[in-house]
Each structure stands twice: as C-alpha cells, then as structure tokens.
C-alpha cells in the first residue's frame, strides 16, 4: 500500500513538472512546497532566510512556518526579509486620452500606507518572537541581486520564499537560483497549491471546481502556532519614515487607513463583524449593492496578504451556521479566487494583455471594434466620474474616496467602460490605472 502511494505521489510530480519538498513535519503537506534550487547541504550555514513577498503576515503563513521548521531542524535562527518595491525609474503624466503604462505608475499613498502599516504590524509581532525582520530598499540594484547579497552576507543555509505568479517575481526567482543554497517556494496564498490543483490553465470555475473540491479535505486544515527563535538574534531597527519616502508615492490618492486599518488583527476584527452581520444573508443579498453590510470587505486584507483565506475558510466552515451563506462565501473565496492564480500561473507572458483572454472573447472584441459609440470619454473624465451615467459616476467617486467598490457595481463599471472606448489596448490601461 505504501509503495502504491509513493508511486502515485511520484506520478503527480512528474505530471506537474514540480519537485516537492521531502523534509516536512506532520502538519505540512509536502505539495505546498516546491524546490527551485537544490544547492549545497544546508547544515553548513548560519541562518534560514524567509523572503516575504506576497504574504505579509506573521500568523497562518505556511511559508513562514516551514522556514521556522527548517531553522529549528538545523538549530539556526530564522530571519525574515522584505524588499520594498522599487519606484518606477520614469513616470508619465496622465494624458487626457491615454493613461500611463503600468510600469511607469507610482504606488499610490493609499496602497503604500496600507502596505507599510501591515509591515509594521508584522515587524512588531515577529519582534515579540525574537525573529528579526529586515526591510530593504533597492537603490540602483536589481531586487534579486540585493536578495542574493543579503543571503550571502548572512551566510544563509536555506532561502524560503512565498508564491506569486506575477512576471517580475518569477524573474527575480529565476535569477536567485544561481545561489549555492536550497531555494524553496511555498504557496501560502492558495489553500490548494496552484501547481498541485491543476497542471494546466483551466477553462473556468466549472473545470477547476471539482479538482479543488477533491483536494480540499487534505489541504483545508488548521495552522500550527509559530514558535519563537530559540537562538539569540539581533533585531534591526527600521526607519519607517525612510521607507515611506523611498516609495515616492502618488499622494493624489489619499490613505484610508483610518477607515480600513492594516494588519492581521484588524482583518480578523472585520471578519468577525461579517460573521455576525453578513454571513446569514450572504447567499441571498451579496449581489445587491443596496446591502453593503452583507459583504465581507475582506478583499484589501486578502489581496495584500495580511490575512490567509484558509484561516477564514476554516473558521466559517467550523462555525456550522448559515450553510447557504457559507457555501457561497467559500465558492467565491476558494474556487473563484484560486482560479485567478491558475490563470496567471499558466499564462505568464500574456495575463495582462488581450492575448491572454479566451479566443471567443478576443473574437467578440474584434467583431465589435468598429461599432459606433454613442459616448466616448477621456481618461480624466473617467477618473473624475464625469460621464452621463449616474451609477457609474457614483461608484467611481466611492472608489476614490473609500477605496472600495461592490462587486456587482464593479462589473457595471467594466461593462460600460468597454462601451465607451474604441481602443481595447487603452481600455486595459484604464482598468489598471483605476
């Protein structure tokens, strides 16, 4: 029986092209981690480094937990590294008709303040566990090179990194494989690791859903508690004011941290409120923008990695109340959310272009590209909510002022914006900007 199970596991790895980690504790599914670089024997180093990229939290973080496991095994301290995203080298002003490219857009104050606020929470929490956290600012140095230098200077034995499917992160990790130590990537964002859920890009939710549901009993588990460093470690001081200045943020989009405070504790407070006020009606009223209190409002925390959706799914499932609301919440948070990672993971070159869309969608856009438009609006008009559509304008104003938008209204915005634009390439830039 054991040999049969071993052969089955080997077959899964061969089909997916992924080499899973082998040295795992009982609470860790080996499929969560994949080996990017084997390197030398890790026992010869002086620490284990966890490079935090996407999952900015100290709790319910499989990548951090696995890194701590390795540190304990090798009797070495754990260090956490975060590299601030470099500001664009060149910036473009917003043209009346053509929005700037993504690569030249500054981080907004809204995103930057939320990011830094979350990092400060993580730094404080790790400090209480005697786990040092370093926040680096790349200056005329490639991010991957800075991480490689950090690993070398700290004499790291192993580098653990969390998972992101985005192109620039994939590029960093490809450069990092030149180091002579093991580099292990752990998917701490998806409940079922993206490379294990499916070996191909799925058509849609209907094809991914059965695959996820088959695997969920093994992967939707509780988390162990992160143990403190037992080895003495010096905790570096972080100048958060310097970090703020380094990001060179676009201050035209104000912070909303007072409305939506960052950090895992704030996220769980919001989730507790949703369980008591929204879950019972979530199935029935979640698509009605008149009932905003029914929505969870967890998207900022999930998207910024400040809370694990696996924690939310575990808690709502074990609440054992409101089965219809629970089913709808899990469908959106597991199937629909993990479908997006599947799309980006298996469409690495085109996920942010029209070429990444399904062929029928491309054909439809091409067919209607010459249709007469009753209304056409510039980038400025759309940003300011100056259209003939009162609902569209109101939703844009809400997005600017509150940083949130109901899912049904978001769909309305996208549909109308498609009607009001001739050039679909520019249309995508509109969406990225707004």
How does the language model describe each region?
Residues 1-230, 325, 397, 416-421, ...:
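Trp/Phe/Arg-rich N-terminal binding region typifying the photolyase-homology
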Residues 2-5, 12-15, 27-28, 43-45, ...:
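Glycine/tryptophan-enriched, flexible segments
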Residues 57-61, 299-303, 403-408:
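Short, conserved micro-motifs enriched in small and acidic residues
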Residues 66, 146, 270, 297, ...:
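Short, hydrophobic/aromatic alpha-helical segments in well-folded domains
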Residues 331, 336, 340-395:
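Aromatic-anchored, charged helix-turn/loop surface patch used as a conserved interaction hotspot
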Residues 341-342, 407, 425:
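Acidic/polar loop patches that form or flank catalytic/metal-binding clefts of enzymes
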Residues 349-350, 356-363, 367-369, 410-434:
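Active/binding-pocket-proximal capping segment
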Residues 379-422:
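Extended, compositionally biased non-globular segments
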